[in-house]
Design a protein with these regions (language model features):
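Active-site loop immediately N-terminal to the catalytic Tyr-X3-Lys motif
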Residues: 123-127
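Residue(s) in the substrate-gating loop at a strand-loop-helix junction
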Residues: 116
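C-terminal helical subdomain
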Residues: 156, 177-213
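Conserved NAD(P)H cofactor-binding loop of Rossmann-fold oxidoreductase domains
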Residues: 64-69
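Active-site helix of classical SDR
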Residues: 96, 132
Length: 234
């Protein structure tokens, strides 16, 4: 998303927990000297509060936590659950809640929340991830209705399988072999479709033609069984 916005002339406030990724971002965007870079662990409340103190009020907020977690029910630790939930849901809420009073002072502004298709369909062995994404999806839809009269648009994107290295980092590299090619969506397509929907003032968007076609069947038992079969390790 940052690459797309940079190409379109935006000045960016970029936040990353990884020093290596932050360094790569600085090198990639070296021609844009208006960008700001922050190194925070967004799974911690103190980091969100410190970030809110440092940044100016943006015209566009993109909440995109690029992490996933595979965990069978009953096998995660309390710390894992707390950190994942705050990163994917609670921290996003705290960030947006902290910015909304300032956003209301602008003539117009936008909020984009990257949720997941897992927010609206069962994800066996990824229940923590899916439930956190479901929570932020519900929050986004609710504040979207509330803030519409404040000239603040809220768009929630529900991507499916996106071609990034997030699955590998989470130990889910088997998905690259199991999931049919037509179910994968490029990160570039997700960003372009999400940004188009946001500019148009749409509340939700499901990037990718395949996911649009199966949208009426999401949440049904047959869809859940197919999802479980595709995600199963050999």
């Amino acid at each position: 998303y940052a690459k797309y916005l940079n190409q379109n002339g935006w000045s960016l406030d970029l936040v990353s927990h990884s020093e290596e990724r932050s360094k790569k971002a600085r090198e990639f965007f070296q021609n844009n000297n208006k960008n700001n870079y922050y190194h925070f662990d967004l799974s911690k409340k103190d980091s969100i509060l410190e970030l809110l103190d440092k940044i100016d009020c943006p015209d566009l907020v993109v909440a995109n936590a690029g992490i996933t977690m595979m965990s069978k029910a009953g096998e995660s630790s309390s710390l894992q659950r707390d950190e994942l939930y705050y990163l994917l849901c609670g921290g996003v809420i705290d960030l947006i809640e902290g910015l909304v009073p300032r956003l209301k002072e602008k003539d117009a502004s936008r909020i984009v929340i990257i949720s997941s298709i897992g927010a609206v369909t069962p994800m066996p062995k990824s229940s923590l991830y899916a439930s956190a994404k479901s929570g932020i999806y519900s929050y986004g839809r609710s504040i979207g209705e509330e803030l519409a009269n404040e000239n603040i648009s809220v768009t929630i994107s529900l991507p499916g399988y996106v071609k990034t290295n997030a699955h590998r980092r989470a130990g889910l590299d088997h998905l690259e072999r199991k999931i049919p090619f037509w179910m994968w969506v490029s990160a570039e397509k997700v960003v372009k479709m999400t940004e188009k929907a946001s500019i148009a003032g749409k509340s939700t968007v499901i990037p990718g033609l395949a996911y649009k076609l199966v949208k009426p069947f999401l949440g049904m038992e047959i869809t859940s069984k197919a999802w479980k079969m595709l995600n199963k390790r050999n």
